[in-house]
Amino acid sequence: MANDQEMSGWTDLLHSSSKLLEQAAPSSQFPPLQRNLDQLEALSKKLKAKTLRNEAPSQSIAATRLLAREGINAEQLARDLKSFELKTTFEDVFPAEATSVEEYLQQVHEMAMVSAIQEAQKDNVRSFNDYMMKVLEEDWRKEKRDFLQSLSRISMLPKTNMIDTSREAHAGQLVPVGSSPRVSSTPGKELVALANIPIHEKKAYVYGEVVKKLNTSRERGMPFRPAMCFKDAYDTLGAEVTRGKSVNMQKIWQLVQAITGEDSAVRQGVSKRMALAIGARHHLQHGHEKFIMDTIQTHPTQAALGGSVGNLQRIRAFLRIRLRDYGVLDFDSTDARRQPPVDTTWQQIYFCLRTGYYEEAREIARSTRSSQQFAPLLTEWITTDGMVAAESAAIASEECEKMLRMGDRLGRTAYDKKKLLLYTIISGSRRQIERILRDLSTLFNTIEDFLWFKLSCIRDVTGGSSSVVLNDGLAPYSLDDLQAYLNKFEPSYYTKNGKDPLVYPYVLLLSVQLLPAIMHLSKEAGDGGYNIDAVHIAISLVDHSVLSEGSGTGHKLSVMDSNAEASSMIRQYGSMFLHHGDLQMTVEYYAQAAATVGGGQLAWSGRSNVDQQRQRNLMLKQLLTEILLRERGIYFLLGARGSGEEGQLGRFFPDSRLRQQFLVEAAHQCQEAGLYDKSIELQKRVGAFSAALETINKCLSEAICSLARGRLDGESRTSGLILAGNDILETYKYYPEVSLQERERVMEQETILRELEAILSIHKLGRLGNHLDALREIAKLPFLHLDPRMPDATADVFQSASPYFQTCVPDLLKVALTCLDNVPDTDGSIRAMRSKIAGFLASNTHRNWPRDLYEKVARSF
């Protein structure tokens, strides 16, 4: 209905407009226009847009006035609205069908989970990228630091004075880093200079001083304690950062000093390997004594030590602190009618032994009724350094069995655990020890307590733990058993994944695995310079000839193998000084490397076996030759003159005959390596003048050939060789002892030198264009007989010439032919000389002359 009315309205309007159009008279001023509906719509929109533009300023002014009235900056608002963010609506995220609460919550849950997963993925990727970048930067910094340290590890070390090569030069003071050579070097100033350099360079310096003193003492047959001196040198470096670490390098040096026996008397009646274990046990006892004193000082009131300073009083003060929660102790009890005090007999004996107070332990065992049966066993163990008789061990083992059976029936509180440990130590039974470790693993608070117990139990078993059996059929506990048990665990178990890096080598040293400990230290990464410590620990152990005793279980190396490993390490360390030009420190460490394969201290005095002495001499010659080949090496080892009396070589080869033999061999090696200058110098130093001249003639012959082929440096090379030859001949004149045979050889080589010198002058004349003079000199040469006035020579004459002379002949003949081509033949002598040359070549065809020489002869005719 409504549509019909609307249509009728539009019809009436159209009818009215048609009538108006008919009534309108045409005008020339306004021509008629006809538009359809689409055109009218477009024109109306255009008109409306013009109207809106006219109305906009008034509306904008009104809007700005309204915003200002509300305190809003219209310009700021307009700038902010230039950028806007389109956010999704709920209709975009959730479907229209999700109208119930359950479906809505399900959708929210799913969206939250997806968003959480996506955010977690982004966080993981970002964290991974950050971590990888951090690791990459750390690795790069470490690589850069290690590389720079490898380049400059010794660069800041003091350099020796290479000018002073007297016999005492090796014992002189070194100039500290950064100090002037004119300032006297005092220990205080050295420490000040060392304070500003890295720890590994400090160690290298102070240890190097000890090595020089060690070598000097061994050369002179004087006593020296290397481990103690290395430890003292390390102590001068100042405080070491040991926060959170149970073992530092000072502790390891103390252990090395203990196991080598430098701080105690020589142990008789036990093997060298067992003596090392006893030394390790004594080190742990000294450490426990320090622990007791620190505990007493930390708890002075509970210790109640008073004015007593005896060893037994210290042990009782320590027990007052340790057993403070158990009540009154027996040694403090004054009223027997009150509650019975705590019996500490076995505690006192155990801690006296643990601290090394043997006399006090025996006194308590004898004076107490409950331990009187144990007293004779303890006395025997102390007297024999743990090597009790089999009968005593069987008695102690039986007592252990009784206590363990009692514990099985009545509980573990039925016996004193310290009593069980003490009887187990006396028994030395492997079965008892393994049972204690299995059933009573919490007996030991620290690894030091555990290792002290194990070291106290071991027996000196030769050939392995299975070769000796006690009377009751129980096998004794041996050092091999201890090493095998400790080696079950990875190094990271001891070092807490690298947080305490020195614990593992400390455990290896305590269990007399000396070579594995050194090898582990030498490979320990970090800025502590532990590889330097490893080298000097090896020097200390080898000097005492004990390194071969500590190859460890599974590393059954011979004496030579163990010493060779250490020698290689010392040699490699010494070569670092060689690369930096410090020849003084190089020779000190090379001497130690050679002494290491020779058996340590015994090698210096010649008391090692024949094979070790041979190995030492071979390595010493090899290493000294290596120094000779370096720049200033000859001057350093031999001095300004002579064959080593004034240099460092005299330290190692006091016999002049051995020195001469070594230098002749070194000169031969130099010649094989092409180091002719050094070979000539060495031959001259030992008085082998003919050999030196022969080397010069060989080099001069090669230089003349190079010069003839146009080599630029040939002339300077030949001039230097001729000067060197003349210098040798001048020295030869004043040499005191020259044999007749040597004189003849020198004269022969001098003749060859003059012949080569003449050939060189002919080449120079030819280059300068003095062809006639060159031909005259050629005619004078022996063995060729090219003078036209002389008869032809036979082939045998040329064969008797020096090979160095023969080498120069082809180039010489080419020069002669060139000169002949440039000199006019006025009397036929030129043609005669050409014929002589052709005849010479024909009579020596077996020489295989160069093809171009034959061609040049053919062209000349």
Curated annotation (Swiss-Prot):
Name of the protein this chain belongs to: Nuclear pore complex protein NUP93A
GO cellular component: nuclear envelope; nuclear pore; nucleolus; plasmodesma
Example of a GO MF term: structural constituent of nuclear pore
Keyword ATP-binding: no
Gene Ontology biological-process entries: mRNA transport; protein transport
Main location per the UniProt record: nucleus
The entry's keywords: mRNA transport, Nuclear pore complex, Nucleus, Protein transport, Translocation, Transport
Pfam families documented for this protein: Nic96
Xref: InterPro entries: Nucleoporin_int_Nup93/Nic96
Family: Belongs to the nucleoporin interacting component (NIC) family.
Cellular compartment(s): Nucleus envelope; Nucleus, Nuclear pore complex
Binding partners and assembly: Part of the nuclear pore complex (NPC). The NPC has an eight-fold symmetrical structure comprising a central transport channel and two rings, the cytoplasmic and nuclear rings, to which eight filaments are attached. The cytoplasmic filaments have loose ends, while the nuclear filaments are joined in a distal ring, forming a nuclear basket. NPCs are highly dynamic in configuration and composition, and can be devided in 3 subcomplexes, the NUP62 subcomplex, the NUP107-160 subcomplex and the NUP93 subcomplex, containing approximately 30 different nucleoporin proteins.
